[in-house]
């Protein structure tokens, strides 16, 4: 059975989350498309929030 590719916006969110948990700057967002950039930044915010509250460590 074929695997479906993940939605691009879901992938952008996940990559942003990983960047936030890893402590990267939000200025390093690789997306120029507004929708993808918004999703990436949303994931980044959640990742940073999780790191600050102690859910994740580097």
Swiss-Prot record:
GO CC, alphabetical: cytoplasm
InterPro entries: Ribosome_modulation_factor, RMF_sf
Keyword set, alphabetical order: Cytoplasm, Translation regulation
BP GO annotations: regulation of translation
Record Pfam families: RMF
First and last residue of the signal peptide: none
Principal location listed in the UniProt entry: cytoplasm
Function: During stationary phase, converts 70S ribosomes to an inactive dimeric form (100S ribosomes).
Family: Belongs to the ribosome modulation factor family.
HAMAP family hit by this protein: RMF
Name of the protein: Ribosome modulation factor
Organism, as annotated: Shewanella amazonensis (strain ATCC BAA-1098 / SB2B)
Lineage of origin: Bacteria, Pseudomonadati, Pseudomonadota, Gammaproteobacteria, Alteromonadales
């Amino acid at each position: 059975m074929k695997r479906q590719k993940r939605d691009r916006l879901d992938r952008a969110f996940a990559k942003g989350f990983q960047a936030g948990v890893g402590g990267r700057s939000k200025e390093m967002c690789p997306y120029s498309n507004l929708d993808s950039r918004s999703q990436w930044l949303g994931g980044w915010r959640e990742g940073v929030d999780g790191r600050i509250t102690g859910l994740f460590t580097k």
